[in-house]
Amino acid sequence: MSLAYYPGCTLKTKAKNLEDPAIASMEVLGSRLEEIPRWNCCGAVYSLADDDLIHQVAPVRNLIRVKEQGKNEVVTLCSFCLNTLKRANLLMKEDAEKRGTLNSFMDEEIDYGGEVEVVHLLEVLKDQVGWEALAQKVKLPLRGLRVAPYYGCTLLRPREVAVDDVEKPTILQELLEALGATPVDFPEFAECCGSYQIVSSPDDIPKYAWHILNSALSHGAEALVLTCPLCDYNLGQGQKELMKKHDEFDGVPLFYFTQLLALALGLGPQVCHFELNYGEPELLLREKNLLPRGEAL
């Protein structure tokens, strides 16, 4: 089965450890992530200004690319891309005036009215693959690995584009259980990582990181699993600064959900690119006998 796939910019530069494991894992699960042609940046942040329709052109054009392929669904991995594409799609579905203005402006494109559904790969795993079927494919159960699911902002907010229940999401926990790991709930599962304050107020990022990471550790987690490259960067860079200032803080391994998926499916560290991760996750994996000692990353 072929799934229309929108990668977004970061997965082609700084987040190969999010994309490569996903592509390989879906092949094992019987699906192919087929990159849509001529895609462009999603726009990164959804614009809320009524008089700023030009910022909707980028995400809508990507949805048009999917429609041109005859597909009615597009899969994303990056939660920021998901959020922006979903909100632009809702605009095109629900606001006839703005839909007309945008279609008129993009007069060289086919008309678009929200025909494509935007889904996250987590939703594909849950609703199309199924947790039971996924568990049956696991070759290396992640037993003994205690992982805190970190959702961040954009997977769950605003409510109309959330991939799960906003107050009590379980989709990441269910994935971890299917892979044999132990999910560890903690109160800061949806707290903001600081987002683009890394640009405007970089000194604040370690404070966000400490609040989130320390909470996860205090609830018994050994690592975090996440979906967003910006969350990964902020928590990773934040903990680097924390380790400089606090000798007792050793850092927290950060995993993308696709890496744990690929590892459990038996695809090996070469697919997972653990060398690109923050928090030296390979040390934890070796301790749990999930990565052979001396295995090249």
Language-model features: where?
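Iron-sulfur cluster-binding electron-transfer modules in prokaryotic oxidoreductases
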Residues: 1-297
